[in-house]
Amino acid sequence: MRIIGIETSCDETGIAIYDDEKGLLAHKLYSQVKLHADYGGVVPELASRDHVKKTIPLIKEALKEANLTSQDIDGVAYTAGPGLVGALLVGATIGRSIAYAWGVPAVPVHHMEGHLLAPMLEDNPPPFPFVAVLVSGGHSMMVEVKGIGEYKILGESIDDAAGEAFDKTAKLMGLDYPGGPLLSKLAEKGTPGRFKFPRPMTNVPGLDMSFSGLKTFTANTIAANGDDEQTRADIAYAFEEAVCATLAIKCKRALEQTGMKRIVIAGGVSANRRLRAELEKLAKKIGGEVYYPRTEFCTDNGAMIAYAGMQRLKNGEVADMSVEARPRWPIDQLTPIA
């Protein structure tokens, strides 16, 4: 079975073709970073218009890369949510339309389920069950995963997601868009221990998280200490340390609560090297294991959508003729796959 995956939930247009026997046959990704850079963030209308321009050409490129034609495709998977409604509608409309034109089934895919299953694209995929640390620009949550579609949210951010906190703090520090990766790069030059940032909500029971206060703490630290280059690097170090330590503390509690020892890190922030190091240290301490996708599959991409869609199509899930876009869609509402 060969599935083409379409990802347009935010500011990346991702197209991929996945074969259940041969694996990934093609992977195309276009980022809109330059388009939104002048605005300091994603402009939804511009994102939607750019997806309209890029999706069909990328589909053609993916077919060419895989040396396939539309007649070789057995199904279409498209991101139906959560995300920006206009951007989602572009991918959903194109996905549903080409499925109809090609005479194959289509299936809507949950964006975060795609991220959660992205490590399955690797040579050493994680076996079920595990605790997933899903961290991106729009979501931060701890999820108990017993199988595909068997998700229980153990805790989530009550305000800013981790990736959002990185980007907002970077903007506060005068870094260009997208700021999260630039903040992490600046943190590499930081002095450990000069500043100590709080670990939000780690002094209370439960697994919910809060990261918005760290932005205020950063602003106050800059005001009190100046913003010369080394001070900025030291502040970036302390901020990143606080976010990663908080996630590690919450993950440890999630493992204790579930009795599990396997950790999956997924979503855009899963590319962060310090976060990976913190969770690897935790896993080593408890005799567990950590799994994460290669860097190119941490960001939004079509490969994870093609893979997740294949699992859904094999389970008999097929969309009707309507075009489905769900900007809000709790991951624990998905149907388990037997």
Swiss-Prot record:
Annotated localization: Cytoplasm
Cofactor binding note: Binds 1 Fe(2+) ion per subunit.
Catalytic function, reaction form: L-threonylcarbamoyladenylate + adenosine(37) in tRNA = N(6)-L-threonylcarbamoyladenosine(37) in tRNA + AMP + H(+)
Coiled coil stretches, renumbered: none
GO term, biological process aspect, one: tRNA threonylcarbamoyladenosine modification
EC assignment: 2.3.1.234
Taxonomic superkingdom: Bacteria
Entry's Gene Ontology cellular component terms: cytoplasm
GO MF annotation: an example: N(6)-L-threonylcarbamoyladenine synthase activity
Listed cofactors: Fe(2+)
Main location as per UniProt: cytoplasm
Residues bound to Fe cation: H111, H115, D300
Keywords in alphabetical order: Acyltransferase, Cytoplasm, Iron, Metal-binding, Transferase, tRNA processing
Pfam families documented for this protein: TsaD
UniProt-annotated binding residues for substrate: L134, V135, S136, G137, G138, D167, G180, N272
Stated family: Belongs to the KAE1 / TsaD family.
Purpose: Required for the formation of a threonylcarbamoyl group on adenosine at position 37 (t(6)A37) in tRNAs that read codons beginning with adenine. Is involved in the transfer of the threonylcarbamoyl moiety of threonylcarbamoyl-AMP (TC-AMP) to the N6 group of A37, together with TsaE and TsaB. TsaD likely plays a direct catalytic role in this reaction.
Protein's name in the database: tRNA N6-adenosine threonylcarbamoyltransferase
UniProt gene name: tsaD
